[in-house]
Structure formats: structure tokens, C-alpha cells
Amino acid sequence: MALSTITCAALAGCADACKGSIETTVLFAKPAPGGGRNVYVDVTNKPDLGLKKTLLYEGKEFGTFEHVVIINDPTSKYASTRSICFSKFRQGPAVTGGDLTEAGIPQLVVEE
């Protein structure tokens, strides 16, 4: 146990415990049209929430993920995070127009 604590402290990148019933892995973020960021995540434990999508990042294929959603992050609260956990959210309209590879991806606003 002491070894894991020392290792965690030495790495300075240990993840916080998940505080929410829905767990996601952050893929990347893009500037949002109205300010803030759109955070693209893969939902790890609630498969009915996202869509299987092949995503592009800066014009290049980033990968195919099973349960993609976009989290609206107007205050950049989730900058530099590897995962986002939450229980309450509002679902916004799915992406339309713009990048065709993103069409239909559900958008969420996390309410904690």
C-alpha cells in the first residue's frame, strides 16, 4: 500500500476517484462556437448514451470509438482531464451541419 502511494505521488498524474455514476474517457476538445470548449468523450459504462463514430481531429482520422458524446464545457472546467464522471446532465440537440463525421453525436451539459 505504501508503494502505491509513493508511486502515485511520484507520478503526479494519478486520477481522482470517479464521483458520478457515468464514467467517460476524454478523447480531445475543440473550441465551442459560443465560447468554452466541446469535449469529445467515450462513455465507458453507459453504452446507450453515445454513438459509434469515427472521429477526425485537425483533418486526420483520430479513431473509431463505441459510445461518443460531446460535453459542452462553457467554462473550460474539464481542461487537462483524462476522464469526466457525472450523474446528472441535460441532453442538448445532436450535432447537425458542419463536419459530417460529427453528425448525430449527442451533446450533453453536465449538471453534476
Where do the language-model regions lie?
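Structural detector for short beta-strands of small beta-barrel domains
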Residues: A17-L49
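OB-fold/S1-family single-stranded nucleic acid-binding modules
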Residues: Q91-E112
